[in-house]
Swiss-Prot record:
UniProt xrefs under InterPro entries: MFS, MFS_dom, MFS_MdtG_subfamily, MFS_trans_sf, Mutidrug-R_MdtG, Tet-R_TetA/multi-R_MdtG-like
An example Gene Ontology biological process: response to antibiotic
A GO term for molecular function: transmembrane transporter activity
Protein localization: Cell inner membrane
This protein's UniProt keywords: Antibiotic resistance, Cell inner membrane, Cell membrane, Membrane, Transmembrane, Transmembrane helix, Transport
Gene3D superfamilies registered for this protein in UniProt: MFS general substrate transporter like domains
UniProt name for this protein: Multidrug resistance protein MdtG
CDD domains the UniProt entry points to: MFS_MdtG_MDR_like (cd17391)
Keyword Transport: yes
A Pfam family recorded for this sequence: MFS_1
Bilayer-crossing regions: 16-36, 58-78, 92-112, 115-135, 146-166, 173-193, 224-244, 256-276, 290-310, 319-339, 378-398
Coiled-coil intervals: none
Gene that encodes the chain: mdtG
């Protein structure tokens, strides 16, 4: 038992603060290495433009692919053994893998370690499950919205810090620094997260069929998983072409990388500001209204992005898009809380993470394919169509949920 654990009631607000810090540290740790990932691939012996692009894409995507496979297993284990244990397992496991990445000698070793990183991940979904099972239901939207800003903040600061560290100390030391950040996350979680959890034997665990039947509305929960996937597809589809699109808009300027970095970052800043506020509003008026409104608002912003003429116009639209995006995943997570029990929260949030990871893999592939065949501007129009489908699909699923309530 950690020093912070005793017989006193759990202070969920303190747990929220510590979990936020953990999500911030893991978000920063994951994104620290992103700016120079292709450079490290090249350092490991990959040469040639096409080979470098291919391997960079593979080592980036494989982490999400293996995370989507492993998440349900870790979610089930969290429901059996406790969410805090899964937070500790994830932070320590990822820290060890980061050290090994810094020692990799060839691309195959690095590829295997990136896959292992995905297998051992899962800090954020388990943090979501932990907080969701402790926070009062009428504060779920605010709490999960606030928690989401931890990972966003870390992901925003990570690339800047990673780039500076790589320039100052070289590529390999950044992996060791990242590992130390994850180990710090491990100790913060160990000593300051409290959870009263009664372990459940494997025989007493609900099987998949029982998990489904225990849900208040299984079809709605599945539709929320699909909504999460589409949100990530829409977000990821723009990532591969953003820098090239900015270069096309900016023309012959010397600081395209800086401008692209700023435009890539502004949605995260906006989400950071909007997520807790819109989460709190969702607690008052209903997360389903926030979800549908934010999706429609996103469509209305994506369409004009295809017609902008300057980087400034694109940056303003992406800032507004980030404000809407900051409400989407917390609204989905709040609806999942409303429609599942604490007994299966770990698995529900992990299944949702699997769909999110699949979206992280397929989104960039979709964006790259569309831009290669139809140009950069078409990506925004197709993405707007995908999000519009998501809005209609989500509205229909949520509307069907309300019909029985009215008839009853």
């Amino acid at each position: 038992m950690s020093p912070c654990e005793n017989d006193t009631p759990i202070n969920w607000k303190r747990n929220l603060i510590v979990a936020w810090l953990g999500c911030f540290l893991t978000g920063a740790a994951f994104s620290l290495v992103m700016p120079f990932l292709p450079l490290y691939v090249e350092q490991l012996g990959v040469t040639g433009h096409s080979a470098l692009n291919m391997w960079s894409g593979i080592v980036f995507s494989i982490t999400f692919l293996f995370s989507s496979i492993a998440s349900p297993f870790w979610g089930g284990l969290a429901d059996r053994k406790g969410r805090k244990l899964m937070l500790l397992r994830s932070a320590l496991g990822m820290g060890i893998v980061m050290v090994l990445m810094g020692l990799a000698q060839n691309i195959w070793q690095f590829l295997i370690l990136r896959a292992l990183l995905g297998l051992l991940g899962g800090f954020v979904p388990n943090a979501n499950a932990l907080i969701a099972t402790q926070v009062p239901r009428n504060k779920s939207g605010w709490a999960l919205g606030t928690l989401s800003t931890g990972g966003v903040s870390g992901a925003l600061l990570g690339p800047m810090a990673g780039g500076l560290l790589a320039d100052s100390y070289g590529l390999r030391p950044v992996f060791f620094i990242t590992a130390s950040v994850l180990i710090l996350c491990f100790f913060v979680t160990l000593f300051c997260i409290r959870e009263k959890f009664q372990p459940v034997s494997k025989k007493e665990m609900l099987h998949m069929r029982e998990v489904v039947t225990s849900l208040k509305n299984p079809k709605l929960v599945l539709s929320l998983f699909v909504t999460t996937l589409i949100i990530q597809v829409a977000t990821g589809s723009i990532a591969p072409i953003l820098t090239l699109y900015v270069r096309e808009l900016a023309g012959n300027v010397s600081n395209v990388a800086f401008i692209s970095g700023m435009i890539a970052s502004v949605p995260g800043v906006a989400a950071l500001l909007s997520a807790p506020r819109l989460g709190k509003l969702g607690d008052r008026i209903g997360p389903e209204k926030i979800l549908i409104t934010a999706l429609i608002f996103s469509v209305l912003l994506l369409i004009p992005m295809s017609y902008v003429q300057t980087p400034l116009q694109l940056g303003i639209l992406r800032f507004l898009l980030g404000a809407a995006d900051g409400a989407l995943l917390p609204a989905v997570q709040t609806l999942l809380v409303y429609n599942s029990s604490n007994q299966i929260a770990g698995r529900i949030f992990s299944y949702n993470q699997s769909f999110r990871d699949i979206g992280n893999v397929t989104g960039p592939l979709m964006g790259a394919a569309i831009s290669a065949n139809y140009g950069f501007r078409a990506v925004f129009l197709v993405t707007a169509g995908v999000v519009l489908f998501n809005a209609v699909y989500s509205w229909n699923s949520l509307r069907r949920r309300r019909i029985p309530q009215v008839s009853n």
